[in-house]
Swiss-Prot record:
Homodimer. HAMAP family: Azoreductase_type1. The lineage of its organism: Bacteria, Pseudomonadati, Pseudomonadota, Betaproteobacteria, Burkholderiales. Quinone reductase that provides resistance to thiol-specific stress caused by electrophilic quinones. Also exhibits azoreductase activity. Catalyzes the reductive cleavage of the azo bond in aromatic azo compounds to the corresponding amines. This is FMN-dependent NADH:quinone oxidoreductase. Belongs to the azoreductase type 1 family. The keyword Phosphoprotein does not apply. Pfam families: Flavodoxin_2. One of its GO terms (molecular function) is oxidoreductase activity, acting on NAD(P)H, quinone or similar compound as acceptor. It comes from Leptothrix cholodnii (strain ATCC 51168 / LMG 8142 / SP-6) (Leptothrix discophora (strain SP-6)). Its cofactor is FMN. Its EC number is 1.6.5.-, 1.7.1.17.
Amino acid sequence: MKILQVNSSARNFANGVGSVSSQLAGELVARLRDGEPTASVVVRDLARTPHPVLDEAALQALFTPADQRTPAQAERVALDDALIAEIQAADVVVIAAPMFNFGITAQLKNWIDAIARAKVTFQYTANGPEGLLKGKRVHVVLTRGGVYRDQASDNQVPYLRQVLGFLGMTDVEFIYAERQGMGPEASAQGVAEAREQIAALLQLGTATA
C-alpha cells in the first residue's frame, strides 16, 4: 500500500507544535501503517515546500509542446509533474485541510491546480468529464476555528467533494476537528472528537478499503 499525505496548512508542525491538521493527518497515517507495516508513505508538506501558483507563465508552459519549452518552462511543468506522479502512485491519500476564511488554503488550491490536468488526471468524453484518478481512498482531516459541519457556511466539503470526484476520487471520508479557535478546552475536545472518528474508521476497516 502506498500512502500520500498532503499537509496544506500555512503552518508547519514540528515537535508537537504547530498545525493541528498536519498533526492529526500524521496520526492517521501512523495508524494506517500500524495495520499495514509494509506501507510506504510520501509526505507532501506545502508549508515547508510551497507549490507555485498557476499564473500566466505556468499556463504558457503547460500549453507549450514539451519539445518547444524553454528551460524555465520545462522546470515549471516538472514541478506539477512531480505532484501528479505522487497522487497517481498513491492507494490512500490523506489531506490535512484547515479552514482559512471559510474555504481551503491557498496552498491546497495550488496543489489542486497542479494535479488537475486534462488528458492526464481527467478527460472529456462524449458522455461528459471522466476522472482518471480512480480506485483511491481519500481521508480529509478538516480543522476549523468554529463549528461549520453540516452548515451552509461550510464551503470546504462541497468543493473538495466536487473537485476530488471530478478527478475520479469518489471514495472520500471527512474527519472534523472543530472549535479550534474557541479556547483551550473546546479545542482539545475538537481534537479528541477527530481522534474518535479516526479510531472508528480503523475499527470498521474502511480506512484502506
